[in-house]
């Protein structure tokens, strides 16, 4: 039987019957191979698409889960933010209340401080009045003693019970006076007088002032008088026994508190008074003490 050789796709050859029957057999196999190839390709594409769809579905599910998680977290964060806002509001209200209480407390404290200052001022004034009263009482006692000494002076020749003034001291109306030659500061002068059981001179009136003027011997002397200041300004003058100044014998234009530091008073050689710095060493001093009777 005649045969015809045909080549297959794979490179090998195949013998088929010759003639029309052989050619028919050969060409009838080709559509089968084509259909098989198309089927295989389709299956492959179906598998690939199935894999891609499965992967896309998985990723979509993951994205949806992530989106749900984000929404859940966002809801939680929103709730937490709302809670924080409420807490901030509560804190703001609390702070406002505390601030109001603080302002009220400050106002009450200010009122209490004002009342305390008023009470302290009243107490200070009362203390000053008591001190002034005691000093004036002491001065009154000394005045009575002076009058008594004057009465005793009238019978001095018949009664010599009072001790004489120390050597270099001058006597006048029941008191002894010492006029220094050296010069020093006001504080040192007061110390010198205290060492002699005396004090810087207190001028009680015109008679005593005349006695002092007559014995200046051309020198200046510290008196027992100092300025009283309040808030840096001179409010008055006070003797060393605590009594405020009543009698005065100021020089013209005095006291002037030059440079705001003239706190002590001295007597010029003319007998007139002048305010001066307490640390000045240009003047002597006059000590005074009562006779020892």
UniProtKB/Swiss-Prot annotation:
Residue intervals on the Extracellular side: 53-293
Membrane topology: Single-pass type II membrane protein
Residue positions where Phosphoserine is found in the record: 12
Transmembrane parts of this sequence: 32-52
Pfam family, one: Lectin_C
Chain segments annotated as coiled-coil in the UniProt record: 96-136
Single Gene Ontology MF annotation: fructose binding
Signal peptide limits: none
Expression (tissue specificity): Expressed exclusively in fetal and adult liver and in lymph nodes. Specifically expressed by endothelial cells lining lymph node and liver sinuses (at protein level).
Residues of the C-type lectin domain: 172-287
InterPro entries: C-type_lectin-like, C-type_lectin-like/link_sf, C-type_lectin/snaclec_domain, C-type_lectin_CS, CTDL_fold
Spans within the Cytoplasmic topological domain: 1-31
Tagged with keyword Glycoprotein: yes
BP-aspect Gene Ontology terms: alpha-beta T cell proliferation; immature T cell proliferation in thymus; immune response; negative regulation of alpha-beta T cell proliferation; negative regulation of immature T cell proliferation in thymus; negative regulation of T cell mediated immunity; positive regulation of viral life cycle; symbiont entry into host cell
Cysteines engaged in disulfide bonds, as pairs: 264-278
A GO CC term assigned to this protein in UniProt: plasma membrane
Annotated localization: Cell membrane
Entry keyword set: Cell membrane, Coiled coil, Disulfide bond, Glycoprotein, Host cell receptor for virus entry, Host-virus interaction, Lectin, Membrane, Phosphoprotein, Receptor, Signal-anchor, Transmembrane, Transmembrane helix
Glycosylation sites: 73, 159
Subunit comment: (Microbial infection) Interacts with Japanese encephalitis virus envelope protein E.
Biological function: Binds mannose, N-acetylglucosamine (GlcNAc) and fucose, but not galactose, in a Ca(2+)-dependent manner, in vitro.
Name of the protein in its database record: C-type lectin domain family 4 member G
UniProt source species: Homo sapiens
């Amino acid at each position: 039987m005649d045969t015809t050789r045909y080549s297959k796709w794979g490179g090998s050859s195949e013998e088929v019957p010759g003639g029309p029957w052989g050619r028919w057999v050969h060409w009838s196999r080709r559509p089968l191979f084509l259909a098989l190839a198309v089927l295989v390709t389709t299956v492959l594409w179906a598998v690939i698409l199935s894999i891609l769809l499965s992967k896309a579905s998985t990723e979509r599910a993951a994205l949806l889960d992530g989106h749900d998680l984000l929404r859940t977290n966002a809801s939680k964060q929103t709730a937490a933010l709302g809670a924080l806002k409420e807490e901030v509001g509560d804190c703001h209200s609390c702070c406002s209340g505390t601030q109001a209480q603080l302002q009220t407390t400050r106002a009450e404290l200010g009122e209490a401080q004002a009342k305390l200052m008023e009470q302290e001022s009243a107490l200070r004034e009362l203390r000053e009045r008591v001190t002034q009263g005691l000093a004036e009482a002491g001065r009154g006692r000394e005045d009575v003693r002076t009058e008594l000494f004057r009465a005793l002076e009238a019978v001095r020749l018949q009664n010599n019970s009072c001790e004489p003034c120390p050597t270099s001291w001058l006597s006048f109306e029941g008191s002894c006076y010492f006029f220094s030659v050296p010069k020093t500061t006001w504080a040192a002068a007061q110390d010198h007088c205290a060492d002699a059981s005396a004090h810087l001179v207190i001028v009680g009136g015109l008679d005593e002032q005349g006695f002092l003027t007559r014995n200046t011997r051309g020198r200046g002397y510290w008196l027992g008088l100092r300025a009283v200041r309040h808030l840096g300004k001179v409010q008055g003058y006070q003797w060393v026994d605590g009594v405020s100044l009543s009698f005065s014998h100021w020089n013209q234009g005095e006291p002037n508190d030059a440079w705001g530091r003239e706190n002590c008073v001295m007597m010029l050689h003319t007998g007139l008074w002048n305010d001066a710095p307490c640390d000045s060493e240009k003047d002597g001093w006059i000590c005074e003490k009562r006779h020892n009777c």
